[in-house]
Amino acid sequence: MGNLISTCSFSSRVNSTAKITDSSIWYPQPDQHISIRTFRELNQAPTSSPTSTRTEMFLNGVLSRSTDDLQGEDSRQPMTLTPRQLTQEVSRRLLM
């Protein structure tokens, strides 16, 4: 397994006690495989498992992507949001 690379973002609203923390962990693999696991915390109550796992593989200049949603079919979202955009979207949906 390669070096650990991680990122974290935090969001809260003035008129709410809800606080959301999103973090992603990257484990670069041999031959440029990249595995990404995303975790979400609401009000600092950690989830027991990753919410999704995305794998990217570069072979001969071709990118292959695979995303496993570990929360079920109803919660599938495209994995094209930045951490900040993801936090804003989750905040919007939770605080509606």
UniProtKB/Swiss-Prot annotation:
Chain spans, region Disordered: 66-96
Which InterPro entries does this entry report, sorted A to Z?
Answer: Gemini_C4
Organism of derivation: Tomato yellow leaf curl Sardinia virus (isolate Spain-1) (TYLCSV)
Protein's recorded name: Protein C4
Its biological purpose is as follows: Pathogenicity determinant. May act as a suppressor of RNA-mediated gene silencing, also known as post-transcriptional gene silencing (PTGS), a mechanism of plant viral defense that limits the accumulation of viral RNAs.
Q: Which Pfam families match?
A: Gemini_C4
Q: How does it sit in the membrane?
A: Lipid-anchor
Where does the record place Polar residues bias?
Answer: 77-89
